[in-house]
């Protein structure tokens, strides 16, 4: 999460600068920039929308799991590897590489593609039915803040609305991650038929980890060659 945010913000700033340089106009208008800050205000409905986005993240992981299970169940990697037409077109070695690549990365493709569709279509369907439901993905919201800031220039630093939007970003990320993690964790406990006593121990371990190393839930641990060798 943190890595995505740190990459997206300067990348969007650079892209907005290129668009302004090439077209002579900012990537988004000043009115749109002001609307971005209003929609991401910390005291608005953004936190609720971020929690709902966590549900969509969980749903995309379910779709990814289904896709990978289907791929493995039907032995699609073997079908791609040994299919005469595919091997005749690509060659045996290249067909094997494609089969291995899809076996290792198909779930990631399914998760990202399905999440993209849901982030784009769910608000549209919700608006059609008059639900007023929106999504707040921390990475996309960070990009919106960067684009709006690029439009308004340095004067944006003097706007309280900008700082309210920036302040909301950590909470959006925390809700995205925590809601999707909770749903995935609950599903895993049910799938493994974990008893109530064992669940209490697991919850206690998670709370202890939150107290001692809260950033580990957002920033992955670095594992060097020595740690990998020791575990092996």
Question: Model-flagged regions — what are they?
Answer:
Residues 1, 30-32, 113, 232:
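Generic low-polarity alpha-helical segments
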Residues 1, 43, 105-106:
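Hydrophobic alpha-helical transmembrane segments and adjacent short intramembrane/lumenal linkers
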Residues 59, 75-232:
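Long, compositionally biased intrinsically disordered regions
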Residues 2-7, 11, 52, 110, ...:
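Hydrophobic alpha-helical transmembrane segments of multipass membrane transporters and ion channels
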Residues 6-90, 132-151:
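Catalytic or ion-translocation cores adjacent to nucleophile or general acid/base/metal-coordination motifs
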Residues 3, 12-20, 65, 127, ...:
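Membrane-water interface at transmembrane helix exits
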């Amino acid at each position: 999460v943190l890595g995505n945010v740190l990459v997206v913000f300067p990348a969007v700033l650079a892209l907005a600068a290129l668009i302004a340089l090439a077209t002579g106009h900012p990537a988004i208008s000043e009115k749109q920039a002001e609307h971005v800050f209003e929609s991401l205000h910390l005291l608005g409905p953004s936190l609720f929308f971020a929690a709902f986005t966590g549900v969509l993240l969980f749903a995309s992981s379910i779709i990814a799991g289904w896709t990978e299970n289907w791929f493995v169940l039907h032995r699609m990697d073997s079908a791609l590897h040994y299919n005469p037409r595919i091997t005749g077109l690509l060659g045996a070695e290249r067909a094997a590489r494609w089969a291995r690549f899809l076996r290792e990365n198909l779930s990631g493709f399914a998760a990202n593609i399905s999440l993209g569709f849901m982030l784009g279509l769910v608000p549209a369907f919700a608006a059609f039915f008059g639900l007023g439901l929106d999504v707040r993905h921390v990475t996309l919201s960070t990009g919106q803040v960067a684009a709006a800031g690029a439009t308004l220039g340095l004067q944006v630093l003097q706007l309280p609305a900008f700082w309210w939007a920036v302040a909301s970003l950590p909470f959006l990320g925390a809700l995205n991650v925590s809601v999707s993690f909770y749903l995935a964790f609950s599903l895993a406990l049910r799938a493994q038929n974990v008893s109530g006593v064992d669940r209490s121990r697991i919850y206690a371990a998670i709370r202890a980890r939150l107290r001692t190393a809260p950033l580990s839930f957002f920033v992955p641990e670095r594992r060097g060659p020595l740690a990998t060798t020791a575990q092996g």
